[in-house]
Amino acid sequence: MRPTSIDPALAEIGKKNGLLVWRINKFELEPVPETEHGIFFIGDAYIVLNQKYEGCWDVHFWLGKNASTDEIGVAAIKTVEIDDSLGGIPTQHREVQNYESPLFLSYFTDGIRYVAGGYESGYNHVEDQFKNWKPHLFHCKGKRNVRCTEVECEVGSLNLGDVFILDLGKDIYIWMPPDSGRLERVKGMARAKNIADVERMGASKVHILDDEWDNDPTFWSYFGGVSSVKKVTKSKDDDDNYWKRLSEQITLWKVSDVTGAAKVTMVGQGENLKKELLDSKDAFILDAINGGIFVWIGRECTLEERSKALIWGQNYLKQHHLPKWTQVTRVLDTAESTQFTQWFRDWVDEKKKNTFQPLLFQVSDESGLLHVEEIANFTQEDLDGDDVMILDALNSIYVWVGSNANPNEKKEALNTAKSYLEKDKLPRHKKTSIDTIYQGQEPPTFKKFFPSWDDALFKNQVRSVENMRRLLFH
């Protein structure tokens, strides 16, 4: 059923550029204040709207792993309302906890934080004056896209390779063991400062435990005493999802919904998909393997068909036994994003001229496990000197080697790029070049892909943990 009116909570949408966030509360939308952007209760569902400029909108509905079926349903309905009020042209995205898209993560520069419970959990906010406060332990994991997930406040939750935040209300401890990464430390400090200064309005004090990581009596009192440090294990390597499914072919499917039960028929396969396969009278699903699932809606489709796009995408996941967290994005005929058009060899947009947006990936080799992470809306500051980065400019691949990358990463940098190119499915020139570039020696051909460039950024350790500590807390 189509909504008969627009929710009053949506009155401000489309009026200015920036981010708006709503949380589902008893079948209604509750605006999330800017000070709480990036905090997500895992028992709830949220809607996030980003306006880059008038006419360019991305609407995401985010699902916590414990969100109820009712909350998920309300989020879907409200997403349709937003779509209607903005003329039916936003790009829609379905986001699942722990598997958010790089675009979604790019909105929250200090990373995101998952909080246990849901709307009815009785979570203590600032106005509770810290009464009956229970300790919260957050595990900060990831390279550029850091996620802070609430875990059990016990010694078994700690490991020596990651950063943890112990939130005691009036006191916040950042635990940074020696094996934790530079970026995780910097992001952990930024997140803790945000909690203290913004969420708590200066009512909390931040304690940084780096040199004192194994002997601070107050911190360890919550984990059985200082002697418990011997029980802490090394970091557990998580299997990386980036390389999965890459042996499969990209496929294009036509959607038929005549009987009310959507069916899909394959109309194209491989790396030579052509734009002419799309028909404005119909809807199509593009399975771009690790690029996600796109539901393309022809301009002659009905409003009802537009509203079903993400449902069709979810049904496709079920029919093809794909993980529930697979990215699903709705795109509209004549308003396609480059993330969609890049998969078609002959797609040329005369308005945009260039139909490919460069992609930046962070590559790290932790304990022999290759980890690849895409960074959306990237800037020069996203180049991390601790790792190897891959900049994909379609017909040119740049391997940027950070000065502090480990020896194996440096040695395997070129092979990593070759592996990336061999397994990638984008239609590109057969003679695509691979160039290796070292930190501090970037040529103009590389710098041009960044919004701005400052040669001084990589000098004098301006982005070291110690320097960031001084900037944040002094």
UniProtKB/Swiss-Prot annotation:
Sequence segments annotated as region (Inhibitory for phosphatidylinositol 4,5-bisphosphate binding activity): 247-347
Keywords: Actin capping, Actin-binding, Calcium, Cytoplasm, Cytoskeleton, Repeat
Region entry Actin-actin interfilament contact point, spans: 70-73
SUPFAM superfamilies cross-referenced by the UniProt entry: Actin depolymerizing proteins
Cell location: Cytoplasm, Cytoskeleton
Region annotation Required for synapse elimination during development: where it falls in the sequence: 106-147
Cellular component terms (Gene Ontology): actin cytoskeleton; cytoplasm
Matching InterPro entries: ADF-H/Gelsolin-like_dom_sf (IPR029006), Gelsolin-like_dom (IPR007123), Villin/Gelsolin (IPR007122)
PANTHER family: GELSOLIN, VILLIN
Function recorded in the entry: Calcium-regulated, actin-modulating protein that binds to the plus (or barbed) ends of actin monomers or filaments, preventing monomer exchange (end-blocking or capping). Binds actin but does not nucleate actin polymerization, albeit slows down elongation by blocking the barbed ends. By promoting actin depolymerization, required for the elimination of presynaptic components downstream of the egl-1, ced-4 and ced-3 apoptotic pathway during larval development.
Protein name: Gelsolin-like protein 1
Gene: gsnl-1
